[in-house]
């Protein structure tokens, strides 16, 4: 039975022995919301699956992961087996094909298990979506299956030391030279850096100013000219600056 606000507060005033804290507790309990209200049976199942994974595979290990300051690769691969590595990507190369609401249900529940790991999973999914939406067929075929399964981790590289996350002001540049782009610049606060093997890097094409000059290339760990500077501890997870110095990337990586 729902207890009205006026009745609860009147009861508090009439009975001096009853504290207002208790009245507020009763009011909050009366108006609690079931997080599955309004969801379809399929969405409720998605929610239950993610919640069970968060409680059983993530929450018991929070302290250990925070102390190690590393992403739990074994648990991420279990998440990949459930389809959490490419939530809103096409099933063609391992994506789950969920819509944004369904994906939000998953990430919301995972956050109840470990917010740091869930935050990284959301970033990994951003990388998967960008590659699935804008990558060439060759790139999608070569990289999406391993990203979807978490066999390969992805990092989204936008933020820079001088411009923050203002995409229109970024300075990392790519200049055409023959069949390659020559990339120079730096990135900061890159989640997953050091454990990721695939980096979606936003950069400026041929020095073209403004937002229309921004495009993205896939950079793989180990490429000559790509280096990790150092890891930094943050409130949610760890992140690292990256340096790109005369990094050569084949032009076929751009979608044409």
Locate predicted features.
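Structural signature of FAD isoalloxazine-binding scaffolds in flavoprotein oxidoreductases
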Residues: 97-106, 166-170, 251-252
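A structural signal for short hydrophobic beta-strand segments in well-ordered beta-sheet cores
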Residues: 172-175
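N-terminal mitochondrial targeting presequence
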Residues: 1-33
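Internal helix-loop-helix
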Residues: 81-153, 192-198, 210
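Flexible, small-/acidic-enriched active-site or ligand-binding loops
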Residues: 224-254
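A short core secondary-structure module
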Residues: 184-228
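Hydrophobic, small-residue-rich alpha-helical packing segments that form membrane-like cores
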Residues: 163-166, 181
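N-terminal organelle-targeting presequences
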Residues: 21-67
